[in-house]
């Protein structure tokens, strides 16, 4: 049995990682059963009932709130089947394998890419063989942790296709309002951003599927399951721009129509000609998410993100606007070493982009310190408190961490400045869509005091924010994958 705890945010589609694991273990003769907490409200009852016949229980988990439900599910399994092996995998157990394995309800850790490792673990468990020397596996023997070396990543094209036949697409369609699917054409990114877990997990290695394989499989999936949208979960889809345009050309020439979205960096998008960006749009690309993070060159250097140029942020927005592609720019505030002047510079530049390009929206986030990232030792020196148990990490969700280098006053001003920036941006876009000149002028008048607040950093008595919150109108965060609204509240102004 494979379990995916419910994730913080909107559901987009089935858990791709578990589908990949299911396909691999099925090739070894095991029958996978997937429980997705996002679509199964009573997942603890389902697990308690279905685990009675299970050979093992596996959980894939990210750092943050998912951990809470992972622990609850593990305790249910321990109670119902005390002897059943409980296997943890995914980002968090890979980054903190030892701490995770110290928990009484965790028996085995699958580190990094898990398809081959999990298959080997289950085969050995079925014959009673030892897990010694199983690459990519840590486990407990007589209460002591045994560590094996990591398994080299397998080329994606060498792994079996995820078990999409196990998906009840109707249940996801009811939740999402459409027939959507996450899909990985590649994993890994060659950049060295020091806040990114991807760099630790994949060691800066780009691991793509073949163009022909991707085109063939996606077209098959779209036609077989009547899909409306494919969200590519690649870390940085445009690493190989020739490959990206070849995929787009393959989709376009097939005659099969569907929307698709991806994430990338603005410098790579700017390597494409306007005609190539237009090709992306013609093939179905409706949205691109960019990890712009900051408009302060000084902070970008601290992030080891010098490839990110301010001019590229404007040019990427222009290219996408001209092609008719929506764009979301992710922003990170509260980074170590960031000062008020850096934040003001970011909001100033992003305000210019917002005024010039109506296709651009923003998703500002408070810096989230994930374990094991390259900058981690510096964070501890700066006073960050590291949770000492698996359960402690459940409260470290996106934008929820306490950052000791950010004072209470600075945090309050940051929250309000972000909210005012987003409110101005949202009102401006709303005004541009109004047909009535009178309505447009009225909206522009309402914007003026908000611009004044941002310019002078005057955020006392934020009555405009309270009003917008009361109407549940202000969008604060968006999905980098699709641009869809994720959050409508900032904690400070509730």
Language model features: what each stretch is:
Residues 9, 96-97, 191, 241-242, ...:
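Flexible glycine/acidic-rich beta-alpha junction loops that bind and position SAM and/or redox cofactors
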Residues 1-9:
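Nucleotide-activated donor-dependent transferases that construct or modify glycoconjugates
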Residues 2, 55, 374-377, 387-494:
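Radical SAM enzyme core and accessory elements
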Residues 8-18:
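Glycine- and acidic-residue-enriched helix-capping/strand-helix junction motifs
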Residues 97-103, 337-352:
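Catalytic cores of alpha/beta
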Residues 4, 34-38, 200, 291, ...:
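Residue-level recognition of beta-strand->loop/alpha-helix junctions
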Residues 157, 162-328, 333-335, 348:
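Radical SAM [4Fe-4S] cluster-binding motif and immediate context
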Residues 17, 21-152, 372:
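Glycine-rich beta-alpha loop elements in corrinoid/cobalamin-binding modules
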